[in-house]
Amino acid sequence: MGVDVNDVADFMASPVELTSKSIYPVKSFGSGIAPFYTNLALWVGGYVLIAIYKLEVDREGIGSFTARQGYFGRWMLLVILGALQAIIVTVGDLVIGVQCINPLLFVLGGIAISFTYVNIIYALSTTFKHIGKAIGVILVIVQIPGSSGMYPIEMMPGFFQWLHPLLPFTYGINLLRETVGGMYSFNYLFNLCILGVFLIVALFIGLQLRPLLLNLNLLFDKQLPRRGS
């Protein structure tokens, strides 16, 4: 019949020929998860800043100032240190060989992420004191599985899938992923804008809610040493 037996055997062994083409390829697993660990480092770094610095401004020798002025008195120091942390972390990523299509946007994205995270942690800590600091810890614990940093969010339990769009890490990680694997449409700007929404919420908490709780917080701070003694 003129049929080549070898051709038939090859067809039966592999009836479909697949051609693979990588879209936005990432050269290593380390580069793939670098956005997650970079975000984690920036959040932890911001939390450490809040933990080691006194958040309330000393009134001695300054005179009277408003609650808003007191809030920004520590704010400037913290965001500057947070920006320095972001530069060190992102440049460090580049030095150790993390894949990056656009190094400049990678570093600038890290600074924007750190700025947002420091504002969130600072607002929570100054407004709700120890409870706010505890919320900061809870947030980082929840965001590790809920941000799709290491595994697709579809593989996570339903609770974390529900939280996924509500977490700052989700957009911080996606922001850096754009600079690692390659840009797609306006995703970089979209994630940057969502981080801006979190920033606005943080400023609202710090500037609007904090003054309402200021007297209660001062009373709590005065009573705390007495209880310890």
Residue ranges and their predicted role:
Residues 1-229:
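Membrane-spanning alpha-helical segments of multipass transporters and channels
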